[in-house]
A protein has these predicted regions:
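N-terminal alpha-helical segment
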Residues: 5, 28, 41-43, 71
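C-terminal capping alpha-helices of c-type cytochrome domains
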Residues: 61, 70, 79-104
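Stable alpha-helical elements in mature extracytoplasmic
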Residues: 20, 28, 54, 61, ...
């Protein structure tokens, strides 16, 4: 019985994460893609790549911008209206992107 309950819990978590990723992608297309690129690879020289970053790291940074603890004129405006749920969704989207590196 415990195994069935645990499997159900894991499936629900996976489904919730998939929903967060999809919602995060939609939000990122509107709020983030201009600077950070449609796939998290920055299009502007001063914007960092977000693809493949840790969800925890991204969430902490967005919350720091939102609270004013971390200062940036653009990011402060972008992050200010974000809810905790939207931050979780954006973080899930960018952390779900797989990045590969080619050595020279």
């Amino acid at each position: 019985m415990k195994k069935v309950w645990l499997m159900g819990l894991m499936l629900a978590a996976a489904s919730s994460f998939a929903d967060d990723v999809a919602s995060g992608r939609a939000k990122a297309d509107v709020a983030c893609a201009l600077c950070h690129g449609p796939n998290g690879i920055a299009t502007l020289p001063n914007a960092p790549n977000l693809a493949g970053q840790s969800a925890l790291y991204l969430s902490e940074q967005l919350k720091a911008y939102r609270s004013g603890q971390r200062q940036n004129a653009v990011m402060g405006v972008i992050a200010k209206p974000l809810t905790d749920g939207e931050i979780a969704q954006l973080s899930a989207w960018y952390s779900a992107i797989r990045v590969t590196v080619e050595l020279p």
